[in-house]
């Protein structure tokens, strides 16, 4: 892996072509350029022209920046933009947060509940015990179920709690909550 620098506009353009959560920039570019791993680059360099040098060697990925990037990519993705209902955006955000750090997500959801309601559980029945009208839904890609009959403000506060617990920057939390 090599690291290259791109400007914000180009980064946003590439990120907007994300097909699924967790897709790497290399995968996106390969798809956009119709370049497969088996395709060999053609050597059409003019003699006397120096070959391009790599910008920098790949460095260990900073997990904090990586999770921030993943959330930004989600917000820029076509899949997220196509969601017409707040509950569907809510579910996509939860799936992404879980995929970024299972343990931190688990800790955040354990401490998240209302006066009389449990918001997250490992099964539908636990949520239904706290009210038949909770409309539990399974969070895709996770072992969790979540109640969904809350208003958008409550969904935002649930996301805010989880993201704060997972130590996301306040600006990103605000941006994510503003899109639900």
Swiss-Prot record:
Negative regulator of replication initiation, which contributes to regulation of DNA replication and ensures that replication initiation occurs exactly once per chromosome per cell cycle. Binds to pairs of hemimethylated GATC sequences in the oriC region, thus preventing assembly of replication proteins and re-initiation at newly replicated origins. Repression is relieved when the region becomes fully methylated. Disulfide bonds: none annotated. GO terms for cellular component: cytoplasm. Its main location: cytoplasm. InterPro entries: Arc_rbn_hlx_hlx (IPR013321), Ribbon_hlx_hlx (IPR010985), SeqA (IPR005621), SeqA_DNA-bd_C (IPR026577), SeqA_DNA-bd_C_sf (IPR036835), SeqA_N (IPR033761). This is Negative modulator of initiation of replication. It is found in: Cytoplasm. Residues 86-87, 115-119, 149-155 are annotated as: Interaction with DNA. Pfam families: SeqA, SeqA_N. It comes from Salmonella typhimurium (strain LT2 / SGSC1412 / ATCC 700720). GO terms for molecular function: sequence-specific DNA binding. Belongs to the SeqA family. SUPFAM superfamilies: Replication modulator SeqA, C-terminal DNA-binding domain, Ribbon-helix-helix. It comes from the Bacteria. The keyword Lipoprotein does not apply. GO terms for biological process: negative regulation of DNA-templated DNA replication initiation; regulation of DNA-templated transcription. Homodimer. Polymerizes to form helical filaments. Keywords: Cytoplasm, DNA replication inhibitor, DNA-binding.
